[in-house]
Amino acid sequence: MCIRDSTHIYPTNLKLQKNTINILLGSTLAGKTTLMQIMAGLDKPTSGEIWFNNENVTGMKVQKRNVSMVYQQFINYPNFTVYDNIASPLKITGVSSDETKQRVGKVAELLKLSGMLNKKPNELSGGQQQRTALARALVKDSDLILLDEPLANLDFKLREELREELPKLFENR
């Protein structure tokens, strides 16, 4: 698979099993983020195909793919509260307000955000903003969740906690 004639990603075949956690390792500039962007539909391969759940999704629009992604450089909606940032993918897909409240509460508790749900991103530390972006990806019932170094900006204690807690969250999916 080749992107923009500058990044080559090897091997060309990658198979991910449903309900598993897979880790993509590589050196800086090896193409890990590029591969995840291709899988999410945010970038297109110059050759090859992307298959997910036995379906060719290479040309599928981003909105049609049930994928969540968190970048190392997190992104939050600056005018939304933490609650609204986390709930945004649920609201877009028409999840009821009761279920939204329950799911946001669960992921907020896991990521130690419960006391911050009424705050805006500019009132949070960098680690709290990263956890908000992570919560937004985890709250949605995605077929594929792509995490690009999601724990990199967190303090040591929380990073270690989440290394243990994240797999538990996926066990219930």
Annotate each predicted stretch with a short phrase.
Residues 40:
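Helix-to-loop junction immediately C-terminal to a conserved catalytic motif
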Residues 66, 81-173:
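ABC ATPase nucleotide-binding domains
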Residues 43-44, 91:
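A position-specific signal in ABC ATPase nucleotide-binding domains
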Residues 48-56:
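Conserved ABC transporter NBD signature motif
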